[in-house]
Structure formats: structure tokens, C-alpha cells
């Protein structure tokens, strides 16, 4: 038997009975990409309004007696609802679905069926898989390329069918029904039980599917195909939005246009040209800045070399600069006896460092300097450089170098 969410995708709440409630765990994505394990319960109901993940469609969210349902998964002919609080078997409960999420999934899923059918009918482009994403959805087509003309024709056709208000119906067929052989589909799960659900867009397509769908294409409102991207080997990914997602996309795009108009001081039609001019100007500034930085590095190297303080340990810190700046100084000086300790970046924050000098000394001191500055680095042939997180500890690193030089001098 199909769940209530499949029999009536527009139902938003209903009353049912708890069949069982057992301890369970749920692995979720936490901040920083780490996994978090929640302890809770798997609640099984006599029937459910909440769709369990399947057919490329994510699961629903909702509540059971105002207790949040964090995940819904199918197990054979039943659905497991994960909650953090238990519910008593045999008790009657009120189930509500997160309608905004549900209707969005209905629009994207029915939109996928429509695009898949039209792409096949017009150009023989077969769908091999699809993904209902959080912001956009992707249909994988069995073709190495799809032309802009084909995309435009598919988009025009699907939107005409939406305007034609074609009905969408759901039927259940038995496994031995001969009609099953003529229905589009990618096979059934190994643990499938009961009749086969067939979703039909009148005059366009019939497809085996377990998901929730609109009852009429007019509920899709509009479909926008954003374009295609190269997919897996000999495949193309077609990216699309349906229904309310198109409106949200237009709102974001309009907001970006308004912001760019204000920043660039020009009309929408001139945005691209204005950005190109800014990019060219920035490249020229970067080139000029690099030349000046190189000249400064050469001048700095000569100043250090001719300084009365030359010898032993020579240090220099500049807030502005990069690894190239430090390497130019080291190359110009070419010190084989003096330890040269260069740093660039925020004096109390993060930055870069370079240690140059006698190969044996640098090999010994480089990792220790990195440790003092709470950074990482690598080196060879008398040069060690890396990133530091605590430039505020430069004085400690300098003291370490001075102690080493003093010890070496005393031994000589």
C-alpha cells in the first residue's frame, strides 16, 4: 500500500496511530564538515504524511505531535521517522508536513519528469540520473553535448505544456500487469513491496516513480533551464529550476543587478563592459605594484648588505610584501655566512617568513623557527620558508637565531 503522502501529495496534516518506537541514532552534518551523531528514536506509524527519501527526491520534514521529525527513511513497506523524543506505541498522533519544503520538492520532481520526457521526445536525449539539489536541480543526459538551440527548444516546449494545464495522474499497477513493460523507469529497489506506482503527464509521459507530484502542470508555474555543464564520461548535466525557485532566483538576480548598478555607476546593459574595464585596470595596477615591489626588494637588499650591522643575524620585517619580495632580497644578498631572517605580514597576526644562510644552520634552525611562530614550512639548499600564524613571536625567533650564532662563535 502506498503512503498517504503518495496517495494525496497535497495533504498537509492528518491523524494516525504509533505502531512502534525504538532507540536509534542519526548521523548528521555538523559545522566544519564534521559528522555528528544524534541519539533518538525511530517511530513507525500506521500511515504517514511524510515522504521517505527515494526516486531522487529528498525526504520530508515535519512534526508528530509538535515533535520535529529530522529524517524519514523507507524500510521495506514502512517508514522510519527519526525524532529526539519518544512516542508511545498505540497512541494517536497529529502529523504535519513542512509544506514549503514538500511543495518545492513536488515542483522540482514533476519538472524533472516533464523535462526528461520532452528532451527524449524532441531529441532522443535519455535521462540517466537526476539530483534534486537544495538550490538547483540537475538532470544527467546520455549525450556528450547539448546545444543551446536544443536547450531553448526544450524550455519552450515544457513551458507551453505548463500553460496547457496538462493533468498529472498517479495509478497503481500490479507487478504482472503488461503495461508495466511500457512504462519509463530505472528499475525497482530490491526491497520493493506492493503495487507499482505510475505517474502520468497526460499525452506526454508515463513513468514509474515513488515521489510526490503536482496534480496539474499549471502548479509548476514556470521552468527555467539555466544551461548545461560537462558531466561524467560522455554525459551532460542540464541544470534547471521550477516554480517558486524561479521566482527566488529572479529576486536574487534583481538584487545583484541593483547592487552592481550602484557600485559600477552604470545601467544593467553596461555591467559586463564596466567589470572588464575594472579587471584590466586591476591587472595593470598589480603589474605596476609588482615592479615597484621588486625594485624595493633590490634596494632593501643593498641597504642591508651595506649596513654597519651586517653580519651574524640580519632581520627585516615589512607589513607589505610576499614570498617573492623575500626571495628577491635573499637572491640579491646571496649570503652564505650570515643568517638572514625575513618576515612579511601583520605584526601581530599571520604572515610569511624566510630564513636563508649556511645550509647546515638553516636545516637545523628552520623547523625550530616555524615552531616558534606556530607555522609550517619547508626548505633546501640554505633556504627555509613558510607560513606563520603568530608573527608577534618574531622576537623569540630572533633570539633563537642569535643564541645559535653566539654558540657557534664561542665554539670556534
Curated annotation (Swiss-Prot):
It is found in: Cytoplasm. It holds the Pfam family tRNA_SAD. GO terms for biological process: alanyl-tRNA aminoacylation; regulation of translational fidelity. Its cofactor is Zn(2+). Coiled coil: none annotated. Binds 1 zinc ion per subunit. The modification Phosphoserine is found at residue 174. GO terms for cellular component: cytoplasm. One of its GO terms (molecular function) is nucleic acid binding. Its main location: cytoplasm. Zn(2+) binds at residues 109, 113, 209, 213. Keywords: Cytoplasm, Metal-binding, Phosphoprotein, Protein biosynthesis, Zinc. Belongs to the class-II aminoacyl-tRNA synthetase family. Alax-L subfamily. Functions in trans to edit the amino acid moiety from incorrectly charged Ser-tRNA(Ala). This is Alanyl-tRNA editing protein Aarsd1.
Amino acid at each position: 500500500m502506498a503512503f498517504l503522502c503518495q496517495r494525496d501529495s497535497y495533504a498537509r496534516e492528518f491523524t494516525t496511530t504509533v505502531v512502534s518506537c525504538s532507540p536509534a541514532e542519526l548521523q548528521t552534518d555538523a559545522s566544519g564538515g564534521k559528522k555528528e551523531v544524534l541519539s533518538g528514536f525511530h517511530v513507525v506509524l500506521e500511515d504517514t504524511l511524510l515522504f521517505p527519501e527515494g526516486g531522487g527526491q529528498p525526504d520530508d520534514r515535519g512534526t508528530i505531535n509538535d515533535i520535529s521529525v529530522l529524517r524519514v527513511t523507507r524500510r521495506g513497506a514502512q517508514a522510519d521517522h527519526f525524532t529526539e523524543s519518544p512516542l508511545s506505541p498505540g497512541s494517536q498522533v497529529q502529523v504535519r508536513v513542512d509544506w514549503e519544503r514538500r511543495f518545492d520538492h513536488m515542483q522540482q520532481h514533476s519538472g524533472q519528469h516533464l523535462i526528461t520526457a520532452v528532451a527524449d521526445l524532441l531529441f532522443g536525449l535519455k535521462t540517466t540520473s537526476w539530483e534534486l539539489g537544495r538550490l538547483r536541480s540537475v538532470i544527467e543526459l546520455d549525450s556528450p553535448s547539448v546545444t543551446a538551440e536544443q536547450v531553448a527548444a526544450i524550455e519552450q516546449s515544457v513551458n507551453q505544456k505548463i500553460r496547457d494545464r496538462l493533468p498529472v495522474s498517479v495509478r497503481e499497477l500490479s507487478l504482472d500487469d503488461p503495461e508495466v513493460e511500457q512504462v519509463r523507469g530505472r528499475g525497482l529497489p530490491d526491497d520493493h513491496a506492493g503495487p507499482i506506482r505510475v505517474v502520468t503527464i497526460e499525452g506526454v509521459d508515463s513513468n514509474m516513480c515513488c515521489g510526490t507530484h503536482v496534480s496539474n502542470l499549471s502548479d509548476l508555474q514556470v521552468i527555467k533551464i539555466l544551461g548545461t555543464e560537462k558531466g561524467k564520461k560522455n554525459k551532460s548535466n542540464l541544470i534547471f529550476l521550477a516554480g517558486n525557485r524561479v521566482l527566488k532566483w529572479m529576486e536574487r538576480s534583481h538584487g545583484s543587478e541593483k547592487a552592481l548598478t550602484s557600485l559600477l555607476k552604470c545601467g544593467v546593459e553596461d555591467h559586463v563592459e564596466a567589470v572588464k574595464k575594472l579587471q584590466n585596470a586591476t591587472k595593470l595596477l598589480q603589474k605596476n605594484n609588482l615592479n615597484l615591489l621588486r625594485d624595493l626588494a633590490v634596494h632593501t637588499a643593498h641597504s642591508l648588505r651595506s649596513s654597519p650591522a651586517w653580519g651574524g643575524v640580519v632581520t627585516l620585517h615589512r607589513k607589505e610584501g610576499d614570498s617573492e619580495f623575500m626571495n628577491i632580497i635573499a637572491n640579491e644578498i646571496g649570503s652564505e655566512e650570515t643568517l638572514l631572517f625575513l618576515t612579511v605580514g601583520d605584526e601581530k597576526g599571520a604572515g610569511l617568513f624566510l630564513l636563508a644562510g649556511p645550509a647546515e644552520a638553516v636545516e637545523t634552525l628552520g623547523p625550530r623557527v616555524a615552531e616558534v611562530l606556530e607555522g609550517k614550512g619547508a626548505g633546501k639548499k640554505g633556504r627555509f620558508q613558510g607560513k606563520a600564524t603568530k608573527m608577534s613571536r618574531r622576537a623569540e625567533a630572533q633570539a633563537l637565531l642569535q643564541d645559535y650564532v653566539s654558540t657557534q662563535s664561542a665554539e670556534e
